[in-house]
Amino acid sequence: MIEDKRLTDTELEAITDRITGDWVSRAAVDFADAVAFHESLPPHKRFAAVLENAEAVLCQPRAGVPRLDEHVELLQHLDEEGGADLLPTTIDSYTRDNAYEKAAEGLARSRETDSSELNGFPAVNHGVEGCREVVRRVDAPVQVRHGTPDARLLAAVTLAGGFQSFEGGPITYNLPYTSAYDLETTIEYWQYVDRLCGAYTERGVTINREPFGPLTGTLVPPSIAIAIVTIEGLLAATQGVRSVTLGYGQVGNLVQDVAAVRAMAAIGAEYLPDSVTVTTVLHQWMGGFPRDEARAHGVIGLAGATAALVEPTKVITKSPQEAVGVPTAESNAAGLRTTDQVLRMLDEQSITLDGVDREQALIERSVRSLLDAVYEAGDGDIARGTVRAFDAGTLDIPFPPSDAAAGDVLPARDDDGRVRLLKFGAVALDDETKRIHRARLDRRADTEGRELSFRMVADDVSAVSDGRLIGRPGDD
């Protein structure tokens, strides 16, 4: 059974030897050479330092295209025209599935046709030197954003290539993405990723790690999301990671979102070791977007307002073309500017929201209950407890494609749009918390004159793309 135990240097080296060879040579990811490259980078390209010294909310988009020059130009555009403080490199789907041969074919077609035949940057195929070229040619810190359950080779290549932040984790890049891996396997894979990050950190190169807070991106209750990213932060800390950015996906109700990010920061400070610097990220709305770009800007603006009120360390922005596919560089930059405009205007105001403290207390109590259940299931071992808690359903997520989660929890919005649980499954929440959730949902049912049912959930899933927050009867 998996244990929350730090890999030894010998184990780290053995895994690196095992995963390299076919697509990347062992020599290409030479650790001493990689550390020297990181040390050559100027301070403004050091991701953790920029995060941890930020005096205002930082903005970061999502972006990635297959050809290296085009990818660099895209990032430069987002920096210069969008004002991005931090830059992404979003990895293509084939690489996420470890299908490097297919990624190579897509990259070759992209070069032949002068077009994008992949939906991201195939970092493994570009290799360490290709990654270093990206880092050299842009003028801001760059993060690897992907969705890879087995990210070991991707981490080895991109970290040797000069990237200093790596998104994801064994839960957040398993349960929402795939049915191919059990949780114990991905925890083992990510122990390598985190230990590699820890090894760099011990040599003076701080690598930031960021659990993916939005999970399935669909009505995820804040307490569940926060418990899971906290677990991933704890697993990373065991392996020597010292910079952790806890992530949360906006649900759309201002009070609940502000309360959730504050709760996440408080829980992170409470549970993670003092040796770890904890920062936070708010992901703008991850659900369906309106097709009308003006309305899409409205969704982005609300997220910007949320970020202004709660002041996470950074906000991951969206574009007004989310509903139609991969956004253009111009659209992506527009989403950054919309967010920045709202942040700047609200920075000059003092706004207090009623009910935040009460909601934050409810969220924190729920998170502690979930984490207690994990520790109890693992007899104090967070890795073992995570596997057992998901097996038992005491920790769960809604709408998982993975068999590693029961998927027995069902969320719905209450009468002012906060995400509650309609079905609890076996999730480890106390009776009083369940009563609060049910009472809030009953109030909505009374308002709408209908029974609590899955129809309400389905209406909520499509509400934002239809121009509302709550899926009321007759809105279509």
From Swiss-Prot:
Reaction(s) this enzyme catalyzes, per UniProt: (2S,3S)-3-methyl-L-aspartate = L-glutamate
Keyword Isomerase: yes
Entry keywords, A to Z: Cobalamin, Cobalt, Isomerase
Gene: glmE
The protein's assembly and partners: Heterotetramer composed of 2 epsilon subunits (GlmE) and 2 sigma subunits (GlmS). GlmE exists as a homodimer and GlmS as a monomer.
Protein family (similarity comment): Belongs to the methylaspartate mutase GlmE subunit family.
Listed EC numbers: 5.4.99.1
Gene3D superfamilies: 3.90.970.10, Methylmalonyl-CoA mutase
GO BP terms in the entry: anaerobic glutamate catabolic process; glutamate catabolic process via L-citramalate
Cofactor entry: adenosylcob(III)alamin
UniProt GO molecular function: cobalamin binding; methylaspartate mutase activity
SUPFAM superfamilies, per the entry: Cobalamin (vitamin B12)-dependent enzymes
Protein name: Glutamate mutase epsilon subunit
Family annotation (Pfam families): Met_asp_mut_E
Pathway noted in the entry: Amino-acid degradation; L-glutamate degradation via mesaconate pathway; acetate and pyruvate from L-glutamate: step 1/4
Xref: InterPro entries: Cbl-dep_enz_cat (IPR016176), Glu_mut_E (IPR006396), Glu_mut_E_C_dom_sf (IPR014714)
Cited function: Catalyzes the carbon skeleton rearrangement of L-glutamate to L-threo-3-methylaspartate ((2S,3S)-3-methylaspartate).
Residues binding L-glutamate: 62, 96, 145-146, 167, 173, 177
Annotated organism of origin: Halobacterium salinarum (strain ATCC 700922 / JCM 11081 / NRC-1) (Halobacterium halobium)
Annotated TM spans: none
